[in-house]
Amino acid sequence: MASGKATGKTDAPAPVIKLGGPRPPKVGSSGNASWFQAIKAKKLNSPQPKFEGSGVPDNENLKTSQQHGYWRRQARFKPGKGGRKPVPDAWYFYYTGTGPAADLNWGDSQDGIVWVAAKGADVKSRSNQGTRDPDKFDQYPLRFSDGGPDGNFRWDFIPLNRGRSGRSTAASSAASSRPPSREGSRGRRSGSEDDLIARAAKIIQDQQKKGSRITKAKADEMAHRRYCKRTIPPGYKVDQVFGPRTKGKEGNFGDDKMNEEGIKDGRVTAMLNLVPSSHACLFGSRVTPKLQPDGLHLKFEFTTVVPRDDPQFDNYVKICDQCVDGVGTRPKDDEPKPKSRSSSRPATRTSSPAPRQQRLKKEKRPKKQDDEVDKALTSDEERNNAQLEFDDEPKVINWGDSALGENEL
């Protein structure tokens, strides 16, 4: 017997509750976008991607038999002098039976389509994963456990735990075009390109350039909120926010250089990669409460393990050696260099060098203004380009498994 409360019910779907923050970028028609971020060619007319492993992005929610699909080429353009100009292609992943090529079976030949499958995948089956509605869901960050695309491609770094208020460009570090497997990552760090600290410093600079300006009032609020929720604003020293650095007790992290530079020190961002999130700290720590005269004291003991085969293992060890109980010290490469003997001697009438002839300054010619800039892109092209960065000469950064995680800069 039907209940009287059922009166007025309909079969209409429940309204979608959208998360806060700005809308994510749209790709193609609404509701038909890839679940994953794109890989981007480094140069125009690059060949189609080849993968070290299966080429299927990591997705722990799917069984092995469902891990198959295709990468589809997406042409890109940007406005420029004299009209729109092509930029290197982007490639998006879709599961078999979904997306723009949903009518194709796995392996069917078509221009701009590259089929991929994990070992043990049932390529005769069709996926029920569907596609992404950009108004409701963010792109999922790309990760390849068995090896990514070849060196002709790259992708922008997106932290795994980012919120909807942070777009992919919030931590855009031009992330690795080939994240190494654990076997291949051992002992391969070399050159300034692989320096974790330098790259972390670059991320901070990029964030400050692209991010919104922090007002003095906002900076003051960041530095003086409840102690456990404070963050260091740009231009602040560490001890201005968290008190003087000490040895052997709480507040023992940071040498004099880090204290002076605050978040400008790239080592800060590097170490934030190892700091637990709020949830990890609460549910993964040994929590010890203790009543004291001034209130309830909560102690959180958490251990982060950096595997020895992590590509940045040596850098993390180096930072810890410098910064744990580091008050009163500075990195060796930051110590002031002694003046040379010739420059330290006072100049005399006989030994003073002859004055240098000053070069005539060249007159700066005014730059020619662009007379014609065609910004007319079609609506589809604007949607396709909305999420993409146009880096003329992107630097490949190999973060591997130790990519910068969630931070609160």
Swiss-Prot record:
Region called Disordered, residue ranges: 1-32, 44-69, 121-194, 238-259, 326-409
Name listed for the protein in its UniProt record: Nucleoprotein
Biased composition range(s): Basic and acidic residues: 180-192, 247-259, 368-384
Biased composition range(s): Low complexity: 162-179, 341-356
Domain of life: Viruses
PTM comment: ADP-ribosylated. The ADP-ribosylation is retained in the virion during infection.
GO CC field: host cell endoplasmic reticulum-Golgi intermediate compartment; host cell Golgi apparatus; ribonucleoprotein complex; viral nucleocapsid
Keywords, comma-separated and alphabetical: ADP-ribosylation, Disulfide bond, Host Golgi apparatus, Phosphoprotein, Ribonucleoprotein, RNA-binding, Transcription, Transcription regulation, Viral nucleoprotein, Virion
One Gene Ontology term of the molecular function aspect: RNA binding
Function: Packages the positive strand viral genome RNA into a helical ribonucleocapsid (RNP) and plays a fundamental role during virion assembly through its interactions with the viral genome and membrane protein M. Plays an important role in enhancing the efficiency of subgenomic viral RNA transcription as well as viral replication.
Species in which this protein is naturally found: Avian infectious bronchitis virus (strain SAIB20)
Disulphide connectivity of cysteines: C320-C323
Keyword NAD (UniProt): no
Subcellular location: Virion; Host endoplasmic reticulum-Golgi intermediate compartment; Host Golgi apparatus
HAMAP family, sorted: GAMMA_CORONA_NCAP (MF_04097)
